[in-house]
C-alpha cells in the first residue's frame, strides 16, 4: 500500500479530520489558503481506497472547472500522491479513471445537457467548488445524488471565499438554519475557516502583503480575512426576515421576475410573494441561471 501521508499545513490537517468525521463539510476563507487542494486530496483518496466508486467535482461553470481543477489543482494533488502516471483523464467525457475502476467526474452546472447526464448517476463523494456562485436549489439537487455503495460513508464538500451573509452557506454553516427556517442537524454540517496566513509556506513571499493587503476593504475582508460580507446595498437585512407558516387569508399573490442583463449570466430572480393586507410573505423562490425560455417555464 503506498504511503499517502503527505505534508500538510496545520489547517489542512484539521480539515482532513473534519472530512473523516462528518458527512457535510464547508471549507471557507481567503484566497489561496489550501481549501481546494485538501478537498481534492480527500476525494482522490476515497477514489483510491473505495474500489470501483464514482465521485463528482463540480462548479457553476464547466469551463472554470476544466481550467481550475483539471489543469491546475488536480495535477498537483495526483503528483504528490504519486498517482499522476496511473490516473488517466478522459477528455471526451471529462472524468479521471483510476486503475481500480473508480472515477472522478468533472462538471459544470451551466452545461445543462452534460449536467443532466452526469446527475443521472449517484456518487460516493461530491465536491462543490466555489459554491458562492451556486444557488441553493442547485445545492439541494446535488445532495440527492450523494448515495455511495453500502458500507461507505457519504461525503459532501463545499468550499468558497465567503460570499455575503444572504448566501445559503452563511445560513446553514453559521446560523445553523436551512433557508426555510429548519434547524441544521447536530453532529454534521461542519465548517473550517482557512486563510492565506495558514498557507503561507506554499505562497510566494509577496502574495499576502503585496497583493491581498492592497485590495479594497471589502475585498480584503473576503480574500484576506476570509469573512462573510455585509451585503451593502441590499434592500433587505437577514434579521428582518421571520420564517413562519403561510396564513390562510392571503389577499393577493404576485410572481415577480427580475431578468438578468449581464453578459456573465447572473441569476434571474423569480419570486412568489403575497400579502394578507398587513404583512408580506415570500411563498417560494424559483430564481435560476438559465435561458429566457427556462425563465418563462419557471414562471
Region spans (language model):
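ATPase catalytic-site recognition across NTP-hydrolyzing enzymes
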Residues: 200-257
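Inter-Walker segment of RecA-like/P-loop motor cores
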Residues: 66, 70-124
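Conserved RecA-like ASCE P-loop NTPase motor core of nucleic-acid helicases/translocases
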Residues: 53-65
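ASCE P-loop NTPase helicase motor core
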Residues: 133-202, 207-210
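Walker A/P-loop NTP-binding motif
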Residues: 36-50
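Pre-P-loop entry segment of helicase/translocase ATPase cores
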Residues: 1-24, 258
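Nucleic-acid-processing active sites and adjacent nucleic-acid-binding tracks
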Residues: 264, 271-299
Amino acid at each position: 500500500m503506498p504511503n499517502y501521508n503527505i505534508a500538510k499545513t496545520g489547517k489542512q490537517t484539521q480539515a482532513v479530520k473534519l472530512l473523516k468525521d462528518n458527512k457535510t463539510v464547508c471549507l471557507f476563507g481567503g484566497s489561496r489558503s489550501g481549501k481546494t487542494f485538501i478537498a481534492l486530496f480527500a476525494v482522490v483518496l476515497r477514489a483510491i481506497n473505495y474500489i470501483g466508486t464514482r465521485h463528482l467535482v463540480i462548479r457553476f461553470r464547466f469551463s472554470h472547472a476544466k481550467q481550475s481543477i483539471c489543469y491546475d489543482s488536480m495535477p498537483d494533488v495526483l503528483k504528490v500522491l504519486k498517482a499522476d502516471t496511473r490516473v488517466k483523464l478522459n477528455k471526451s467525457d471529462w472524468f479521471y479513471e483510476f486503475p481500480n475502476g473508480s472515477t472522478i467526474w468533472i462538471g459544470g452546472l451551466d452545461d445543462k445537457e452534460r449536467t443532466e447526464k452526469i446527475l443521472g448517476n449517484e456518487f460516493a463523494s461530491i465536491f462543490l467548488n466555489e459554491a458562492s456562485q451556486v444557488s441553493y436549489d442547485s445545492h439541494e439537487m446535488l445532495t440527492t445524488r450523494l448515495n455511495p455503495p453500502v458500507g461507505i460513508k457519504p461525503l459532501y464538500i463545499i468550499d468558497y471565499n465567503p460570499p455575503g451573509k444572504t448566501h445559503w452557506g452563511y445560513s446553514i454553516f453559521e446560523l445553523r438554519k436551512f433557508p426555510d427556517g429548519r434547524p441544521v442537524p447536530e453532529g454534521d454540517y461542519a465548517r473550517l475557516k482557512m486563510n492565506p496566513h495558514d498557507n503561507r509556506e506554499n505562497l510566494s513571499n509577496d502574495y499576502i502583503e503585496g497583493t491581498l493587503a492592497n485590495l479594497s476593504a471589502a475585498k480584503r475582508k473576503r480574500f484576506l480575512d476570509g469573512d462573510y460580507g455585509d451585503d451593502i446595498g441590499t434592500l433587505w437585512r437577514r434579521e428582518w426576515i421571520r420564517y413562519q407558516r403561510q396564513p390562510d387569508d392571503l389577499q393577493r399573490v404576485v410572481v415577480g421576475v427580475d431578468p438578468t442583463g449581464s453578459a456573465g449570466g447572473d441569476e434571474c430572480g423569480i419570486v412568489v410573494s403575497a400579502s394578507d393586507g398587513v404583512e408580506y410573505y415570500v411563498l417560494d423562490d424559483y430564481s435560476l441561471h438559465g435561458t429566457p425560455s427556462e425563465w418563462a417555464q419557471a414562471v
